């Protein structure tokens, strides 16, 4: 299993019926994708897995499409909530962060998350970035010192208006809000209100899905009040430069990780020419509950810093259990690690991405999980790979028919149709639809094999042998496409398929999805004389409910 590390991804080559610039040594563009950084007050749950798998899938696809990709994830380690949790456990806040952030790294390793940096807000370069940005905004007059009096939700680390309270409780988490009064530095939101509205109007892809845009506009149109961005009532945070009785508000701190991660320090020193290219392409993956921070406060912070706001903020829904939000008190939190241990990482990745349309809430049900696993993965995909490998070994000694054997164009057209619309689907984060189309292709191929019944053909008869070889060639090349198509979503399964069929790895330079001619030459798809493995690993063993 691949263990992620701190690295720049290799630039990969693809010819998925799209133009690219690899012949000239150029790249197709830059792509920067981020997850939220996760609080270290507790171990990761399925919602953390969901956000991260979304980001990982599009990062993998963009790499395959010839983009220079940077994928950032990490942990949010400051704030009153962390300070209180550490006190309850009898440890220091840094000690708590050190122990819990490892659990996120372990989960991401188990899920085969291909991040380029795992950032911690306690990292030295991040602390410098936050203090540099704060100082710049103070010098520009976008930050000023005054006094804050109002409501605050500690679990959500957010300031609340009197109007937003629900019987004195936070409208987001339902817990009791507290009244606070203290000296504070403020960020001028009202100064940039019109500029933000103009940006939203002029960039239709800024907030996805589109219906979330109305929520943001409604909030902004009520009139933005300047935001308190420092606290004096606790100590666990980044000190305000020149005024260390204040610590910087956790959200101001956290949002700036997106600059730290791609080298803001070097950028302002004139040593990072890629910074602007990456940030112009940034896609933030966030939960719907933190959209306000990313679509309102963050763009205004960037306006004040002289940086263009994000290209896209993708706000996904929540995973519920029995229609209720997961919580420790209800005992309904789904542990992703236990699911991975039982079903494997790709089964969880597949379920999370195929079960709901991004932007909407989903209801996790273990019985439904098992049904989807057995029907889609074990029966449809697993059986297809197993039977195709078995037939090749039985009828051709494991040799994939070569260029002299044509494919069935009607079957391969299904793959072509999926490939031709792939870029737009990924840009819309329409993962459920992509997976639906992939599994429709899998079912088409299974039906083709069943209807053709190659096991009834006599390989000693020249005419029947020709038909048989065409079926086997069509199946093998189709599985090549399937392996490519599922790679961003189910990388471990794709690699297993490539191992069985001796396919060139997709995460190495120089691979191609299809030759330009319809009848693919075996050597351009497969390697080492086009001979597959003698034994095909069972990809997804069936699961019984009583297990």
Predicted regions and their residues:
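N-terminal amphipathic/basic-hydrophobic helices that include classical n-h-c signal peptides
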Residues: 1-21
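Basic, alpha-helical terminal appendages of large translation-related enzymes
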Residues: 17-30, 70, 74, 146-151, ...
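N-terminal Rossmann-like or analogous alpha/beta NTP/dinucleotide-binding catalytic cores
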Residues: 20-144, 157
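Structured secondary-structure scaffolds
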Residues: 21-73, 125-129, 180-391, 436-438
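Short Cys/His-rich "knuckle" micro-motifs
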Residues: 163-166, 178-184
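Long, amphipathic alpha-helical stalk/connector segments used for oligomerization, subunit docking
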Residues: 357-360, 364-368, 373, 388-402, ...
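Generic structural concept
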Residues: 378, 382, 412, 416, ...
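Short acidic alpha-helical/loop segments enriched in Asp/Glu that coordinate divalent cations
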Residues: 391-407, 428-437, 448-461
